[in-house]
Amino acid sequence: MQDNTGNDHKYQSQNPIGGESLSEMTSTLQHDLTFPQTVDMQAIISETRERVRRAVKTGTFISAESSDELLRGHLNSKLKLIVLYVDLVGSTMMTRSLPVAQLALMVQTFTQEMSFTVSRFNGYVLKYVGDAVIAYFPADANYNDKCNAAINCSDAMIQVLEEGINSVFREHDYEGLQAKIGIESGEHSVIQYILGSNPHVDVLGYGISMAAKLSTLARPNQVVISHGIYFGMHPSFRKKFVQMDLDPQRWKYIHERFQPGVWRSLPLEDGE
């Protein structure tokens, strides 16, 4: 794969992210990419196993912190966000083959643990859409750091699935879970709508739509990212990804200016 690290600054000043040039994307874009922070994955996995065992035994789930308070402070305005869309693989077949109680356990466990993983990387859960979790990382400042956080979060999600959730599920002869992940960035509008007498805050924008579409390109336990995320994240992460060769007749979102390339993650042993 081509080494682009020597052209980071030139690329970031000339090429767009989510329909905008990087200079427009954020006025505080770092010129010196800081090395991504690390987390204690063993602690995260241990906590995951504890919560999953409790859920299997008692049917008790823990709610992740809501992002409504943050968004309410930006109603009717725009935020630059990195959006992570994580989708549960095979859920349609689960609805046809599993008892309702077991289906509920698996989907609730998935959404619970993906949500907690997001929070460990200073991200926020926007909402749940069926069996998918939509999360975001505010990127008005420190865009590169937030790209790193989203990539680290996606890696952690896959580890949490295999080493946290599935290790407990196997103890009870349950099938393991897998996910497909898409990550994109862009400017988003924060809106409020009323459902009955209750106000709800939501986010609309390119990044959410495209992150969902990117996830459909992923294989199970794979991450697919936009060109903006690829060139925004730390160069050390790029060896873990390879550019996808997409047929523009079938994938209509490739655009010379707005989306010139899409990258997929390599298996861990290939990206090390």
Regions found by a protein language model. Give the residues of each.
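Intrinsically disordered, glycine/charged-rich C-terminal tails and inter-domain linkers
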Residues: M1-S67, P220-E272
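Catalytic NTP-binding/metal-coordinating core of nucleotidyl cyclase/transferase enzymes
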Residues: E69-A149
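Short, glycine/acidic-rich beta->alpha junctions
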Residues: M106, G205-Y206
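Short, hydrophobic/amphipathic alpha-helical packing segments
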Residues: V107-M114, S154-E162
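Catalytic core of nucleotidyl cyclases, primarily class III adenylyl/guanylyl cyclases
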Residues: F121-K146, I165-L204
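Catalytic/regulatory signature loops of cyclic-dinucleotide turnover enzymes
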Residues: E184, Y206-F231
